[in-house]
Amino acid sequence: MAFKRKSTALGLERRVRPRREDRWEEDPESQGSSSEDDDEVEEEGVRGQHNDEDEDEEGSDSEEGSEEEPEPEEQTPKVDLSSISFGALAKAQATLPSTSRRSKSSKTATESSRTETTPAPRKSTRSKDDPKPKRSSKHAPQEQTSKKPVSRRREILPDNRRQYRDPRFDPLVGKVDEEKASKAYAFLDEYREKEMSDLRAQIKKTKDTYAKEDMKRQLQAMESRKKARKRKEEEENLLKEHRKKEKELVAQGKTPFYLKRSEQKKQILVKRYEGMSKGQVDRAIERKRKKVAGKEKKELDWLQGARERG
């Protein structure tokens, strides 16, 4: 124990590893005043270090099995920071590790941990070469997957009304025979004629100009539809007669002759003018001439406007 006490008294003579310190230059004015304080702080720090080492040695001796009673530990002297100069404090702070370095190292550690913890992209568990589901037997229902994309179209307000359809004009029934349909609904022509006669009578009675103009437009539309039906019937009758003649010639061993569209129009005009008087034919030709002249005039006006714009 005497040896230990002697070592504490001669603690300044022991070798101490000097810490690596940065060079710090003091002001010439504060060098004289701070040198003594620095020496005192260094001496007290060395004494505290030696006391700590002695305490460690005592703990090791007690653990090895010595039955000696431990002596009361010497209290380390407390340093009064108010008596220390700023130069000494700055020097002591320079020896400590900087907080900026710690923060940078912590940032890099967090970034590396983030990169390590980022999950890898998911891979589809289903391979492209998966076999399609097969039926157990030909009588069993076929298995279908439920993982199908849902269509983006949505029926917001469903129409719950019953949808009616006419089976006569349904394509599922088959192709419509116009000749049979015209014969079956021939009575409609009488109804149309009656409607036209009623409209003519109303046009004569009404005094309202707007209503009269409306009824005149309706009558004109009905007459134009009637003329269109009549022209269509004439064309069909002409083709029927031509096919009948050609069949007879083919039976005699001659080659068939098919009418062109232009020939059909010529023969229709000839038949139409045959049933007219001379005055009716002249009026029909005059109307046709005016119609063609008006069409040509419109085309010329359009061409002149296009040239002026160009």
UniProtKB/Swiss-Prot annotation:
Bias (Acidic residues): 24-43, 52-74
Record's subcellular location: Nucleus, Nucleolus
Span list, region Disordered: 1-175, 210-240, 288-310
Compositionally biased spans, kind Low complexity: 106-121
Chain coiled-coil ranges: 192-253
Organism domain of life: Eukaryota
Record's compositionally biased regions (Basic and acidic residues): 12-23, 152-175, 231-240, 293-310
InterPro entries: RRP36
GO biological process, one term: maturation of SSU-rRNA from tricistronic rRNA transcript (SSU-rRNA, 5.8S rRNA, LSU-rRNA)
Keywords associated with the record: Coiled coil, Nucleus, Ribonucleoprotein, Ribosome biogenesis, rRNA processing
GO CC term (a single one): 90S preribosome
Job description of the protein: Component of the 90S pre-ribosome involved in the maturation of rRNAs. Required for early cleavages of the pre-RNAs in the 40S ribosomal subunit maturation pathway.
PANTHER family given in the database record: RIBOSOMAL RNA PROCESSING PROTEIN 36 HOMOLOG (PTHR21738:SF0)
Subunit structure: Associates with 90S and pre-40S pre-ribosomal particles.
Family that this chain belongs to: Belongs to the RRP36 family.
UniProt name for this protein: rRNA biogenesis protein RRP36
